[in-house]
Amino acid sequence: CFIWGDVRATTDEEKLAAYSQGREAGRRAIELAPRNALAHLFYGINTGRWGQTRGVLRSLFLLSELRETIRQTLDLDPTLAAAYALAGNVDYEVPAMFGGSLERAEGYFRRGLGLDPHFTALRLGLGKVLRKQGRVAEAQQELRAVLDEAAPTNPAEWSTRDAPQARTLLSGPRP
């Protein structure tokens, strides 16, 4: 669902449909296994991607539900690195006036990297946060580490999303 929406869908309508299906599958998984952290994570990722595709400001009504899903996921399994990626991206994407926080996002990304230093989505997120904070040298170091990663946790995400974004950020204008 979220993978289909990220990789195969070519229009926003297709992405929204894929993420909606993913949300529904996640909701059913939670009903069947309410103590399963991956079920909560799957629901949260699809909800976040749906909101991101629709537009962050147009999707603020989902924020409290998404934060609760993240909390439940981390309560169930605080070692799940992908949950920290989700939490960090939410705090990065949501404007501060609506509850987002670059400092909190940085903390989530760093905690996730402490659990899995090869999770390139976490490192990319950290690089984006540092860049937005004006910490350009640190950001470039993290973004180069994404490109230099020899054993990414998720090679598909690394090759289709993380490395291309890191390359773009490194070659683009500085903030």
Set out the residue ranges of the language-model regions.
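Terminal, low-structured helical/coil segments at or just beyond the last alpha-helical repeat
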Residues: 132, 136-175
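Short coil/turn linking the two alpha-helices of tandem helical-hairpin repeats
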Residues: 3-12, 49-58, 90-99, 132-134, ...
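"A position-specific structural signal for the A-helix of alpha-solenoid helical repeats
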Residues: 3, 42, 49, 86, ...
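Structural signature of tandem alpha-helical TPR/SEL1-like repeats
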Residues: 10-24, 54-71, 97-111, 134-142
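Canonical positions in the second alpha-helix
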Residues: 29, 72-73, 111-112, 145-146
